Amino acid sequence: MTQGPSGDQRIYDLRGVEFLYGGTHRALQSVHLRVDAGERIAILGANGCGKSTLLQILGGLLFSTAGEAQAFSQSLTEERFRDASFNAFFRRRVGLLFQNPDVQLFCPTVLDEIAFGPLQLGLPREEVLQKCREVTRMLNLEKIASRSPHQLSGGEKKKVALASVLALNPDVLLLDEPTAGLDPRTQVWLVEVLDELHSVGKTIITATHDLSLLEEIADRAYVMDEEHDLVAEGSPEEILDDLDLLLRVNLIHEHAHEHEGFIHRHGHLHAFAHRHDHGDRP
């Protein structure tokens, strides 16, 4: 496997990756990205910028229409995934949590849902049951294990979808807007779970537009613009300090008003302090 600059194992290496839906609608534009083992990465961008498409390429569900995408030093191509041994290897090592948990939930009970993935990969039944017990205990799902996923609240569904991913014990977690639709308490719970997973060496890549969580979920961030390109990379602190960048990619908004004869422009960074630019008198 390719070694990163610090000697760590390189998980992902994307070079000039592009993607077109239907051969005409551009979703990704010349994306360059690298991820080493054990990193916490955020992919930031406004709705519709291509974050979900990028995660699905990283998850081996979509394939680039130009450029090269590699994972574990192997090309992520449709042909490569026809190899049953590589497909099984990849599916065991990479788990994807969709933004909408209903996409992942289709089994009669929560326990069936958690067991589905490991059983599909051919793991022994006793091992699958042990994994189910561990995951339900970790995510506090014991009381709802026999219920239908479709009878659960949005937050409970998200927990079950995450449990179905964790049951495979993947090395890499791809999370698409994981806090979307969650109440504040469940958001805090999820961040704590992600911290615990990172502490045991998991590589975590989170696509989000929620800047208030950035410093808690990532050590490095990429920023996508509305032209579907990665336009910046840096630490959470560097990204959050660059208000011009955040305005340009539509992650914060700005408004102007007059005060004491001057024009004040405010860039609102959600839960953070906002910028005051003093312009000329009108």
Question: Which residue ranges define each predicted feature?
Answer:
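Helix-to-loop junction immediately C-terminal to a conserved catalytic motif
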Residues: 59
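Catalytic Walker B motif of ABC-type/P-loop ATPase nucleotide-binding domains
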Residues: 173-176
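Conserved ABC ATPase "signature" region
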Residues: 126-144
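H-loop/switch region of ABC-family ATPase nucleotide-binding domains
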Residues: 208-209
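Conserved ABC transporter NBD signature motif
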Residues: 67-79
